[in-house]
From Swiss-Prot:
The modification N-acetylserine is found at residue 2. The modification Omega-N-methylarginine is found at residue 580. Residues 260-273, 341-352 have a biased composition (Gly residues). The lineage of its organism: Eukaryota, Metazoa, Chordata, Craniata, Vertebrata. Residues 1-14 have a biased composition (Polar residues). One of its GO terms (molecular function) is zinc ion binding. Residues 241-251 have a biased composition (Basic and acidic residues). Disulfide bonds: none annotated. Its main location: nucleus. Transmembrane segments: none annotated. Induction: Up-regulated by 17-beta-estradiol. The modification Phosphoserine is found at residue 252. Residues 27-37, 128-139, 171-189, 207-219 have a biased composition (Low complexity). This is Zinc finger protein 703.
Length: 590
């Protein structure tokens, strides 16, 4: 750099000329320029590096060079202005930015319509383009300002930019200029209406509005407006644009504003427009009657396009029981749609078919920690939420580490071992497994409904699939579970657990397994804190295999026994499920 930076002292004309002129190729800068301060824009523009950089970076800021697209106009237009309006990239950006927006005000739309009529009318329909442009210009004067930027805005869904502009515009212009002549020719209107098959110009559902009443009306421009708004609602966006073009040349802006507000919503404009024109005598609900296509627009509140049930409807067991993140095509033996107590009864309670695939839930593929924060991360859990009794230390029957992953895997972040009171001896008997599901204040799901004929279903999952047998009482379910749990090595397995020596029979093992596995609440009153948790976590949950668990049988007993010294009989039922543990770890359950 031969010249000094901007903050230096002023230079003489000779040094300035030699520094910025590149060795005398240019004449020296005049003294008036050189006497300016160095930070002045005139002197900065004469510096050699800035001039070279301007030359080199003249077109690097543009993705498309405009001179390759079209010849430059005679007036000196900077490439930035030229590129900002005309390049395909800019048009695409304009189009994308206008997709979800409401329609522009009537003046700007009429401006674009007039531009389209001037441009395309001579090619298509020379005889009719002149009155169209003239009346559109007159309507522009009526409605006030005319923003020039709207001419270049490309609206892909607006029929004003399509091929039939001249006919559409002349139709709307004749509506405004000659009061009743154009509305008395319904064939002309039907000609420029695009969804003519699904949207006839006159409503087919027995409305009292007839051709004679609308054509003989003195304000013919408003006489045809109910049919256009009908057609707009039936035909979606295209009919709506035509309706606005037909209504906007009128001096009274109320129907235009009303129809613009009700673009894709059936019945939103019915009441106000009946007050404005007095001829729209059909109810708004009849707008989507026979012969009309219901307006589907994802941007405006109308009929729902997506077949999702409302948010007040619960979903069946594929969410609550077995996490929609684990779809059944990967888990053929553990089908979430048949997830035992939850799957069968929740689907039955909600009126869903029992074998409905889990993909019917809108959460299929959702990650369980982010969306289903309150659900248990145990893949064998019935899907109840953690009750307040887990954290409050009340008398839940098996309050130990229900979630072996702990806060690292659960978004809820519960402590690893829940505090609990020492249990009463009665709670250790098999009556804990026989307690029927009470009417629960916290769980209003389908499997808690008391009017079900068979409210208890077996949730045993073997290698061949879930059992899913249903029983009327918990005693029958318990006796059925004894057939599952009567394994030859059950007593040896029980001997490994602290405090389990008192249970010397497989029946007691089945009782404990049923109490833990089915998560039945202890035999307390329905409103008591002990029954607040439908999902009572198993005591030695840390002892089962878990890919992220840091402690297994040895440390698990040490963790659970101090908090629950008498809870030994409530061993982990997963020690009996050898084939399930192998399949669960192979399937990547967390």
């Amino acid at each position: 750099m031969s010249d000094s930076p901007a903050g230096s002292n002023p230079r003489t004309p000779e040094s300035s000329g030699s520094g910025s002129g590149g060795g005398g190729k240019r004449p020296a800068v005049p003294a008036a320029v050189s006497l300016l301060p160095p930070a002045d824009p005139l002197r900065q523009a004469n510096r050699l590096p800035i001039r070279v950089l301007k030359m080199l970076s003249a077109h690097t800021g543009h993705l498309l060079h405009p001179e390759y697209l079209q010849p430059l106009s005679s007036t000196p237009v900077s490439p930035i202005e030229l590129d900002a309006k005309k390049s395909p990239l800019a048009l695409l950006a304009q189009t994308c930015s206008q997709i979800g927006k409401p329609d522009p005000p009537p003046s700007s739309k009429l401006n674009s319509v007039a531009a389209a009529a001037n441009g395309l009318g001579a090619e298509k329909d020379p005889g009719r383009s002149a009155p169209g442009a003239a009346s559109a210009a007159a309507a522009l004067k009526q409605l006030g300002d005319s923003p020039a930027e709207d001419k270049s805005s490309f609206k892909p869904y607006s029929k004003g930019s399509g091929g039939g502009d001249s006919r559409k515009d002349s139709g709307s212009s004749s509506v405004s200029s000659t009061s009743s002549s154009s509305s008395s020719s319904p064939g002309d209107k039907a000609g420029f209406r695009v969804p003519s098959a699904a949207c006839p110009p006159f409503p087919p559902h027995g409305a009292p509005v007839s051709a004679s009443s609308s054509s003989s009306s003195p304000g013919g421009s408003r006489g045809g407006s109910p049919h256009h708004s009908d057609c707009k609602n039936g035909g979606g966006v295209g009919g709506g644009e035509l309706d606005k073009k037909d209504q906007e040349p009128k001096p009274s802006p109320e129907p235009a504003a009303v129809s613009r507000g009700g673009g894709g919503e059936p019945g939103a404009h019915g009441g106000a427009e009946s007050g404005a024109s007095g001829r729209k005598s059909e109810p708004p609900s009849a707008l989507v009657g026979a012969g009309h296509v219901a307006p589907v627009s994802p941007y405006k509140p109308g009929h729902s396009v997506f077949p999702l049930p409302p948010s007040s409807i619960g979903y069946h067991g594929s969410i609550v029981g077995a996490y929609a993140g684990y779809p059944s095509q990967f888990v053929p033996g553990l089908d979430p749609s048949k997830s035992g107590l939850v799957g069968g009864q929740l689907s039955g309670g909600l009126g869903l078919p029992p074998g409905k695939p889990p993909s019917s839930s809108p959460l299929t593929g959702a990650s369980p920690p982010s969306f289903l924060q309150g659900l248990c991360r145990d893949p064998y859990c019935l899907g109840g939420y953690h009750g307040a009794s887990h954290l409050g230390g009340s008398s839940c029957s098996t309050c130990s580490a229900h979630d072996p992953a702990g806060p690292s895997l659960k978004a809820g972040g519960y402590p690893l071992v829940y505090p609990g009171h020492p249990l009463q001896p009665a709670a250790l008997s098999s009556s804990a497994a026989q307690a029927a599901l009470p009417g629960h204040p916290l769980y209003t799901y389908g499997f808690m409904l008391q009017n079900e004929p068979l409210p208890h279903s077996c949730n045993w999952v073997a290698a061949s699939g879930p059992c899913d047998k249903r029983f009327a009482t918990s005693e029958e379910l318990l006796s059925h579970l004894r057939t599952h749990t009567a394994l030859p090595g059950a007593e040896k397995l029980l001997a490994a657990y602290p405090g389990a020596s008192g249970l010397g029979s497989a029946a007691a093992a089945a009782a404990a397994a049923a109490s833990c596995h089915l998560h039945l609440p202890p035999p307390a009153a329905p409103g008591s804190p002990g029954s607040l948790s439908l999902r009572n976590p198993h005591t030695l949950g840390l002892s089962r295999y878990h890919p992220y668990g840091k402690s297994h049988l040895s440390t698990a007993g040490g963790l659970a026994v101090p908090s629950l010294p008498t809870a030994g009989p409530y061993y982990s039922p997963y020690a009996l499920y050898g084939q399930r543990l192998a399949s669960a770890s192979a399937l990547g359950y967390q």
